[in-house]
Amino acid sequence: MGLPIEAKDSEISKKMIIFVVILSLKTNNMDNSVKRVLFVNSEIFPYLPESPIANIGRYLPQGIQERKKEIRSFMPRYGCINERKNQLHEVIRLSGMNIVINDVDRPLVITVASISSARMQVHFIDNDDYFHRKSIYRDDK
């Protein structure tokens, strides 16, 4: 089930829709249900400058995690995100797969970094064809 959250960024005058996918998986005890959350956002602070969208991307997952839910946060790895400064490293078990988009086989590379103050990990979807640009929402060539 997707829960749309709408946020406006006055600087770029666009509406962005953020979807939180909540997956309910059964545990060994059939009476209990563990909630696992997959959070995918276009911006997460501190990896991109503060904005309404980046702040939602930063603090909403932390709030969900503090309520004892298991959460995974994902965002694109734009060219402006510094791998060394943010201590990104590749997640071998998630990388190495391919994704087919419009009949073109593309490699999937996932990197991860931590927000230590929140004890939270952020996974980055890395693909040069789609995200390797200095600007977030437009391709400045």
Each PLM stretch: what is its role?
Residues 2-7:
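Residue-level detector of structural "landmarks"
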Residues 9-11, 18-26:
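Short, positively charged and aromatic/hydrophobic N-terminal segments
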Residues 31-50, 75-77:
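Nucleotide-activated donor-dependent transferases that construct or modify glycoconjugates
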Residues 43-56, 82-84:
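A short, glycine/small-residue-rich beta-strand->loop->alpha-helix junction that serves as a flexible
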Residues 59-69:
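A short, Lys/Arg-enriched amphipathic alpha-helix followed by its capping loop at the start of a domain
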Residues 77-141:
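A conserved catalytic-core segment of Leloir-type glycosyltransferases
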